[in-house]
Structure formats: C-alpha cells, structure tokens
C-alpha cells in the first residue's frame, strides 16, 4: 500500500490532491447482508468474511431486478480493512504534506430514533463511533 501511495503522490501535479474513501464501524465487519431497495431492483451489500487477526475481509454485491432471479456475486471485493490513522500515517510516509479527514454529518432521527448520515462531509479530527460509517481522506501533495 505504501508503494501505491508513493506512486499516487509522484503522479500528482504540484498542489494536487489524492482522495480516498473508507468505511468502518462494528456493523461493517459483521457477516450480514444489507438490502437497499430502489425502484425496480434491489441492491445487496454482503460482508461474507472478516478475519479479526488480519483485518482481511471479503464483500460481495448482488442485484435483483423485479421479476428476475437474484444475480449473486456480481462484484467480489477482498481487501484489508484499514483504519483512518493507519492510512494517514502511510500517506505522510509516502510524501503527502498534509491529510484531512472528512466525517459525515447526521440527519435528524427517524420515528424509531435511528440516525443516518446526511451526505454532507466536514473536516474534523474527532468523531463519535457509529455502527457503520463512511469517511474520506484528502491528501495534499
């Protein structure tokens, strides 16, 4: 990963920015399936495996169109789950002059008291642990 970050740094113009997205939280490493329903189809995000000794994991995306059979394992992802600070440390080691973590704001609680992200991200160095989260890192050359 360090070599990849070094290559990304070298490929940027002066003043360039390299963005990464990452996700985490306790729900993100549980073997389960999240189902998202859209008009005419369902999208499935499945955590198929998580190894707590190595943080290696496998995720899959499945789809089902209305009136059709479910298409399983359309996309398979196998990677290591990295933490925000691990990545920021590696980015600094790769030569980036500055990194900024962006955290998602929260929407108003629903009738069950559940709170989700509002789609707006802001720079911060502190965040509450959420069941699941998505965040971004901006890395300046």
Question: What are these model-derived regions, one by one?
Answer:
Residues 4, 41-44, 77, 102, ...:
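Sequence-level detector for tyrosine residue identity
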Residues 8, 49-51, 126-128:
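Short Gly/Pro-enriched turn/cap motifs at secondary-structure boundaries
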Residues 81-141:
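C-terminal lobe and adjacent flexible extensions of AdoMet/dcAdoMet transferase-like proteins
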Residues 1-17:
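A short glycine-rich, Lys/Arg-flanked "PGG" loop and its adjoining helix->strand segment in the class I
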Residues 19-90:
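SAM-dependent methyltransferase
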Residues 18-19, 98:
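A short hydrophobic/small-residue beta-strand
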